[in-house]
């Protein structure tokens, strides 16, 4: 063993064959808002800049070839002004039709398959939240489902979902590839629901688009279009801080733990925490859409 830390600078080797345990320690000299925060830029490009002495976003010049989104990120950081493309946002909103659902799924991934027609680490949906608005000014309604931790949750999940989305209207999600993939997996395993699921998929619209395409971008988003960054940037008064469960990974682990849990009080408490978390996800989408609709 060595008594001194080797004098090796950070580089691509920090990630190979996996992320080094000293990753954060060795990056203490990297400032906030650095080139490593740039969205959609290859790691090799970032380290190429780093080796040339370019570390802060302030040091990135126009001559450096970068993707459009990264250039927007740098420009917003440098001039301190939010980017809001009103025409692009207006066009996006014209493609969304009321009545409108806001939908979010939660899944868990058992390493050892627990159910027929499943595979190791398959994402098994066990919960959804739906907010519903008949029109822009109508009161918000809420529907939800959380499976009992007894047996395969997929059939009760899809049956309740199809029932709860039976009104006409678009279905808004955040990052539609996740929900659509889960729905297609259910239709493959349970083909009796295939036609209904295909119709449901045809109604899905993606709220991620204005942020992914940088129609709306602020420095607080740190180059990300994840809802966990977009929400505090657009609706700072709304956050997950007060919730016992504040991210999807913990929701998965919490639900999976219920299969072994015998204490009814613990079960009820954890179920309530799961319901509150998933409800917050779709309520966040409601508030984000309201913010976009308020742009004149």
Regions found by a protein language model. Give the residues of each.
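N-terminal accessory regions of nucleic-acid-interacting proteins
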Residues: 38-100
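An acidic- and aromatic-residue-enriched active-site/binding cleft used to recognize and process polar
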Residues: 25, 105-108, 135, 176-178, ...
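Acidic, Mg2+-coordinating catalytic module of metal-dependent nucleases/exonucleases
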Residues: 1-35, 43, 52, 222, ...
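Conserved RNase H-like, two-metal-ion catalytic cores of nucleic-acid enzymes
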Residues: 88-167
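Conserved structured core elements
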Residues: 39-43, 99, 120-124, 148-159, ...
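Conserved DEDDh/DEDDy metal-dependent 3′-5′ exonuclease domain
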Residues: 1, 142-252
């Amino acid at each position: 063993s060595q008594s001194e830390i080797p004098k090796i600078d950070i580089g691509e080797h920090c990630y190979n064959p996996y992320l080094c345990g000293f990753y954060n320690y060795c990056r203490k000299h990297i400032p906030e808002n650095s080139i490593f925060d740039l969205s959609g830029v290859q790691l090799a490009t970032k380290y190429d800049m780093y080796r040339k002495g370019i570390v802060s976003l302030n040091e990135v010049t126009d001559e450096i070839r970068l993707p459009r989104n990264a250039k927007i990120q740098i420009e917003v950081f440098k001039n301190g002004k939010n980017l809001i493309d009103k025409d692009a946002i207006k066009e996006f909103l014209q493609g969304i039709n009321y009545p409108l659902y806001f939908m979010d799924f939660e899944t868990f991934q058992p390493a050892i398959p627990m159910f027929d027609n499943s595979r190791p680490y398959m994402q098994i949906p066990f919960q959804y939240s739906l907010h519903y608005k008949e029109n822009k000014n109508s009161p918000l309604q809420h529907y939800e489902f959380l499976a009992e931790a007894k047996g395969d949750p997929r059939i009760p999940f899809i049956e309740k979902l199809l029932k709860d989305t039976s009104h006409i209207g678009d279905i808004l999600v955040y990052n539609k590839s996740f929900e659509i993939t889960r729905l297609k997996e259910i239709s493959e395993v349970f083909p009796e629901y295939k036609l209904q699921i295909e119709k449901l998929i045809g109604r899905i619209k993606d709220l991620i688009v204005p942020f992914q395409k940088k129609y709306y971008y602020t420095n607080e988003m740190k180059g990300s279009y994840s809802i966990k960054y977009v929400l505090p940037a657009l609706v700072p008064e709304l956050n997950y801080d007060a919730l016992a469960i504040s991210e999807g990974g913990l929701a998965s682990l919490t639900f999976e733990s219920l299969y072994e849990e015998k204490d009814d009080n613990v079960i009820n408490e954890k179920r309530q925490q799961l319901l509150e978390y998933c409800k917050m996800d779709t309520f966040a989408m409601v508030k984000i859409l309201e913010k976009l609709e308020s742009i004149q």
